[in-house]
Amino acid sequence: MLTARLTALLLAVLAAMPLMAEVGRPKVGLVLSGGGAKGMAHVGVLRVLEELKVPVDIVVGTSAGSAVGALYASGMEVQEIEERFIEMDWVSSFRDDPGRAYKPVRRKRQDWRYPVSPGIGVRMDGLHLGGGIIAGQNLGFILNELTRDAALVEDFDELAIPFRAVATDLETGEEVVIGSGNLSEAIRASMSIPGVYAPVTLNGRLLVDGGVANNLPVSVAHELGADIVIAVDITDPLLEREDIREAFSVVGQLTTMMTRQNTERQLKLLDDQDILMRPDLQGLSSADFYEAPALFELG
């Protein structure tokens, strides 16, 4: 069904292209929203675009969308993206433990006695928690591995497709568009869920998940010169009252409120020639990392 809808929309867009012939083919910008594990549905969308031979000139992503978008922009084939995502131990990204196989015997004994380490520290002025429950070391390892083929690229305009990742300045609340530097660090900043992962310091700014400021960065694609925007929105729906039961669900609900509000603002920027896609992901959550094949298909 999604393929048929996209085909119809693209045919309508292609029919309008002769009107722009004097200035050349219109630039197509692909915008991928955040959404945790549901971001793997973006890969299914990429597969459809690839099958339909839709040209993509600009890729912009927030949070999970930045991870998928970065790989696609770096020139990785969709099939390889799928394989990499299935192989990766995404659940380990929510731990800083590098795995028992890599630990000395002494650490293994400590872990057996003290299986949970909340990252609490003590200083002269009192008891302190870290910037997030998770420092993000394992997430960094995963992203380094995923982007190893583009590790030497510092200007994201030099990737196979120009790319931007969107993060949020924790001090000001402003969106930060990252277009240069280390690709894995840019993704890491864009995916730094507040309170879960420690913020990332990049170019002197303290950055967290881009979904806080701009979860569906249509405006960024327009600023980069996109004439046609294909926006894929997998923003979480708000929880029902009966599903808000503990602290994590409360925090999650507040985060969803913020992302939905800024997403609605971005949706108003879409023009008639733009395409909005909202894959039907009912029954799946932002934590369903083991459902990669199903998410690929639903995308």
Indicate residue ranges for each PLM-predicted region.
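Bacterial N-terminal signal peptides
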Residues: R5-P18
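Patatin-like phospholipase
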Residues: L2, A21-T62, A70-L298
